């Protein structure tokens, strides 16, 4: 084997080891993002009360709990995604839809992991990358639309008269909203990484095909040519010499 071929083989083996390790980490963080997505969709802790709010309570995308404002801290909870009429704002309904769509996309991406056993690796990476990018976009829309519903009467009763669209008044942002923003950054990074891995797999496949073609041509020529430079199967035939008789 030529030195260049040996170097190419070593590079290929080194890259494959690193690629598998990065791919495993990418898959693990994709599962983590899916868990984040499910949590922020279900949990009602997107915004909540503070020490200066008239009433205690907290709101999520579709589920919310609000107190009576009396000395007790008992909360009355309402809201269900299966019953849109219980969601206090149209903006909350739209935000819940986009976050749900993001969750479906990322769960579908995890399902696509099974395709690694049947399809081209580069193709699967690119499919997952697009799904992660769309999931991030849907989550961005959900986070941007959600504050548009802060002027709902139920939220104004809890957060005070200063509450309006994109203004929480006396209330504050809770951990689920912050976790959703972290999830957006996570999804964008995962999508970029999947595109890089997919394109690198495509380039590596092309390099392998070129190397195989070179090896095939080289082995064919080596098997045809003899060590002395003659072509095998085409030995030098003796040249007939005409003998003339003397007078």
UniProtKB/Swiss-Prot annotation:
GO terms for cellular component: dendrite; GABA-ergic synapse; inhibitory synapse; plasma membrane; postsynaptic membrane; postsynaptic specialization. InterPro entries: LHFPL. It is a multi-pass membrane protein. Keywords: Cell membrane, Cell projection, Membrane, Postsynaptic cell membrane, Synapse, Transmembrane, Transmembrane helix. The keyword Transmembrane helix applies. The chain crosses the membrane at residues 22-42, 97-117, 127-147, 178-198. Pfam families: L_HMGIC_fpl. Belongs to the LHFP family. Interacts with GABA(A) receptor subunits. Interacts with GABRB3. Interacts with GABRA2. Interacts with GABRG2. Identified in a complex of 720 kDa composed of LHFPL4, NLGN2, GABRA1, GABRB2, GABRG2 and GABRB3. Interacts with GABRA1. Interacts with NLGN2; leading to mutual regulation of protein level and synaptic clustering. Plays a role in the regulation of inhibitory synapse formation and function by being involved in maintening gamma-aminobutyric acid receptors (GABAARs) clustering and their associated scaffold proteins at inhibitory synaptic sites. Acts in concert with NLGN2 to recruit or stabilize GABAARs. PANTHER family: LHFPL TETRASPAN SUBFAMILY MEMBER 4 PROTEIN, LIPOMA HMGIC FUSION PARTNER-LIKE PROTEIN. This is LHFPL tetraspan subfamily member 4 protein.
């Amino acid at each position: 084997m030529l030195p260049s071929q040996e170097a190419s083989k070593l590079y290929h083996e080194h890259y494959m080891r690193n690629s598998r390790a990065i791919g495993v980490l990418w898959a693990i963080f994709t599962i983590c993002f899916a868990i984040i997505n499910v949590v922020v969709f279900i949990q009602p802790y997107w915004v909540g009360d503070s020490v200066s709010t008239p009433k205690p309570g907290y709101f999520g995308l579709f589920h919310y709990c609000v107190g009576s404002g009396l000395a007790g801290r008992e909360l009355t909870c309402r809201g269900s995604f299966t019953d849109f009429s219980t969601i206090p704002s149209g903006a909350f309904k739209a935000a819940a839809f986009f976050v749900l769509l993001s969750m479906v996309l990322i769960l579908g991406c995890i399902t696509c992991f099974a395709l690694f056993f049947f399809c081209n690796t580069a193709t699967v990476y690119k499919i997952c990358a697009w799904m992660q990018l769309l999931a991030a976009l849907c989550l961005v829309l959900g986070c941007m639309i959600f504050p548009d519903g802060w002027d709902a009467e139920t939220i104004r009763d809890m957060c005070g008269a200063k509450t309006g669209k994109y203004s929480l008044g006396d209330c504050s942002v809770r951990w689920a909203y912050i976790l959703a923003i972290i999830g957006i950054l996570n999804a964008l990074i995962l999508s970029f990484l999947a595109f890089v891995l997919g394109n690198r797999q495509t380039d590596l496949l092309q390099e392998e095909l070129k190397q195989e073609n070179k090896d095939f041509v080289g082995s064919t020529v080596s098997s045809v040519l003899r060590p002395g430079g003659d072509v095998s199967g085409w030995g030098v035939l003796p040249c007939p010499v005409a003998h003339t008789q003397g007078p």
